């Protein structure tokens, strides 16, 4: 199985390196392996715990634009929650993000449902997601050559549209693999004149990883993320590779590579007696396109896994007639 996984990852890598330009509708994350529901609705409930997670990412720290003075670096805030529903062989999740890059603001709220089917060696899940995706543009940040041109919009414009996605996810105690697609309906936005139609790109994702124990307290986890986008006949792809080592299920650190873009370093710790509180960070060192990018990016992750409900303990039922 290990050979099969690495062979598959190699095929994915070789087929995905044609270009390294990703659409901005779905912000990239360096710690993608800890955000499965963001990439695939079928991953809802796959961890077996209820987890709330927050992510802050600042892209190209210190980037200074030429058209405005308030900064143009991309900034992303992501919040997600997912939980298993073992009684009905399902999982549910929800995530929302706010993403800004210069005058462009993208926001979304998505709810996910996964049906989880137990197989002999693992669990196969089919998932769907639905929500709203909003795109906004602040024309006040632009400096047009002809400010009096009546065809140039002014002020802030935003529109929200329904948005849908689907995915398939298979996981065992040792490895996982998933395929998903976002923006299946490819909603369109008119932000300005009637001629400026902006459709969402259909983004397909492949995620895969393997947990390999190499000692009593040490395990390593190689993983891969492939993104493929298409809009208006134009396609692009992006590949990220990562290797994380964990000690005593508490301290973890890793390195990664985003194809033709950046080297990444990640580190974190699981806190509290049951390791339910996760704190992590990532640092990107940009190596591609440095003439138009700042050299560094960073990402912070905070997550909490809620204790499992004890089904053996009968709940206390209180009524107005009998109060205990």
Language-model features, listed with the residues they occupy:
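Bacterial Sec-dependent N-terminal signal peptides
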Residues: 1-26, 243, 322-324
